């Protein structure tokens, strides 16, 4: 499972990025939505995990752009404030994770996504 992780805080980006690695997961991290679009353009990632508040283009705008190309893409929006029911209306595979989150929450979410992706016929 290929994960694109977008986080502007360098310490969080490095730590969370490393913690998401392993168990069939490859993580590519970047600091902004604009870089994420470039990285995703060549070979789309299976999952986008992004902070909502980013410099320049926001994480929500990034998610909308990527979902426009692939409405079934998995997206995890990480935010320090409640997003309400908004993300669920964007597509069936969009989830929100409230910051600060426990690593177990992220792990459980990614495990569920991995299982769902593995069950999709290729």
Write out the residue ranges for each language-model feature.
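Acidic, metal-coordinating helix/loop segments flanking the phosphotransfer/catalytic sites
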Residues: 4, 29-47
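Two-component/phosphorelay signaling modules centered on CheY-like receiver
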Residues: 9-28, 94, 113
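Acidic catalytic/metal-coordinating carboxylates
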Residues: 32, 58-62
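C-terminal output helix
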Residues: 101-114, 118-121
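A Lys-centered signature of the CheY-like receiver
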Residues: 8, 99
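The feature encodes the CheY-like receiver
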Residues: 55
């Amino acid at each position: 499972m290929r994960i694109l992780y977008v986080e502007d805080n360098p310490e969080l980006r490095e730590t969370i990025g490393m913690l998401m690695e392993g168990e069939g997961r490859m993580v590519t991290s970047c600091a902004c939505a604009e870089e994420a679009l470039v990285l995703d353009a060549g070979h789309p990632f299976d999952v986008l995990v992004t902070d909502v508040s980013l410099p320049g283009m926001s994480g929500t705008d990034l998610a909308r752009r990527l979902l426009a190309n692939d409405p079934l893409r998995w997206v995890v929006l990480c935010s320090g404030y409640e997003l309400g029911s908004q993300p669920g209306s964007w597509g069936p595979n969009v989830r929100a994770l409230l910051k600060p989150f426990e690593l177990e929450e992220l792990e459980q979410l990614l495990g569920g996504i991995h299982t769902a992706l593995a069950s999709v016929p290729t």
